[in-house]
């Protein structure tokens, strides 16, 4: 069984245990905060938008530096992040909906709930906890599930980041006409990463969609390798959690977009 399959089985177990029902009962409702739409930054900013991630660990990185997460979010906003991503998976990524609930209150930026969503109730919990964006991973959803969950999210005034890794997944994503697609440079089955994977998939981009490169971005040089593919933004976690100088590092990632290749 791959790590991805293991995670999805775990999510199904949580659904059976009414884990998400309990979260809806105990979380403070932070779902009506007015935030700028991520799509506006992606469409109108002349530099790459950065979704700055809060994470504690992952299957490929067992432990990241322990930070004051409240201060980390404030610094992300201070130094130019366009959105905040917060992992909510407890077992594999060390996150929680309680953390999302707490941190979403201290920022006016768009907030992404980073999790493995396979059911509508997970979207309900994400919104209640304060998310304005949810992640939909094409690899773990059927076409019907993808369409249903995307519609459910947008009908509840949430943005959706539709994540793909292969050309086939990109084709499936394009069928629902999403506003934002994330190209994951990490193969979720093997957790191997290649930042140049973005360039391969962006050859098949469409003009009515914005594209974000996710995973494997550790330096400004990594961004320079992919900016000419006409990406609109980046999702960066590990490198931002590790750096000791956010004031220099985060702004250095916001390169000028390639506006001439559409």
Swiss-Prot record:
The record ties this protein, via Pfam families, to:
IGPS
The enzyme's main class, written as a single word, is lyase
- The UniProt record lists the EC number as 4.1.1.48
**InterPro entries linked:** Aldolase_TIM, Indole-3-glycerol_P_synth, Indole-3-glycerol_P_synth_dom, Indole-3-GlycerolPSynthase_CS, RibuloseP-bd_barrel
Q: Which reaction does it catalyse?
A: 1-(2-carboxyphenylamino)-1-deoxy-D-ribulose 5-phosphate + H(+) = (1S,2R)-1-C-(indol-3-yl)glycerol 3-phosphate + CO2 + H2O
Molecular functions per Gene Ontology: indole-3-glycerol-phosphate synthase activity; phosphoribosylanthranilate isomerase activity
Q: Which GO terms describe its biological process?
A: L-tryptophan biosynthetic process
Biological pathway:
Amino-acid biosynthesis; L-tryptophan biosynthesis; L-tryptophan from chorismate: step 4/5
Q: Which UniProt keywords apply?
A: Amino-acid biosynthesis, Aromatic amino acid biosynthesis, Decarboxylase, Lyase, Tryptophan biosynthesis
Q: Which HAMAP family match?
A: IGPS_B
| Similarity comment | Belongs to the TrpC family.
Q: What is this protein called?
A: Indole-3-glycerol phosphate synthase
Please give the organism. Staphylococcus epidermidis (strain ATCC 35984 / DSM 28319 / BCRC 17069 / CCUG 31568 / BM 3577 / RP62A)
Taxonomic lineage of the native organism: Bacteria, Bacillati, Bacillota, Bacilli, Bacillales
């Amino acid at each position: 069984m791959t790590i991805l399959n293991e995670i999805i089985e775990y999510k199904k177990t949580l659904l059976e245990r009414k884990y998400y029902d309990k979260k809806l009962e105990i979380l403070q409702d932070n779902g009506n905060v007015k935030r700028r739409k991520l799509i506006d930054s992606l469409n109108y900013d002349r530099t790459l938008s950065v979704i700055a991630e809060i994470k504690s660990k992952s299957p490929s990185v067992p432990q990241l530096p322990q930070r004051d997460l409240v201060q980390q979010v404030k610094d992300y906003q201070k130094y130019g992040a366009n959105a905040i991503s917060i992992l909510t998976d407890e077992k594999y990524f060390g996150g929680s909906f309680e953390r999302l609930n707490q941190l979403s209150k201290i920022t006016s930026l768009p907030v992404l709930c980073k999790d493995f969503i396979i059911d509508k109730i997970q979207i309900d919990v994400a919104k209640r906890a304060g998310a304005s964006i949810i992640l939909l991973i094409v690899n773990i959803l059927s076409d019907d599930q993808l369409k249903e969950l995307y519609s459910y999210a947008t009908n509840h005034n949430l943005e959706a980041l539709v994540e793909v890794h292969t050309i086939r997944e990109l084709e499936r994503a394009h069928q629902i006409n999403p506003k934002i697609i994330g190209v994951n440079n990490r193969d979720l089955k093997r957790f191997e990463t290649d930042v140049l994977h973005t360039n391969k998939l962006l050859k098949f981009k469409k003009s009515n969609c914005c594209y974000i490169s996710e995973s494997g971005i550790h330096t400004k040089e990594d961004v320079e390798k992919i900016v000419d593919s006409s990406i609109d933004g980046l999702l960066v976690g590990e490198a931002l959690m590790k750096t000791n100088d956010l004031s220099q590092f985060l702004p250095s990632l916001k390169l000028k977009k390639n506006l001439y290749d559409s």
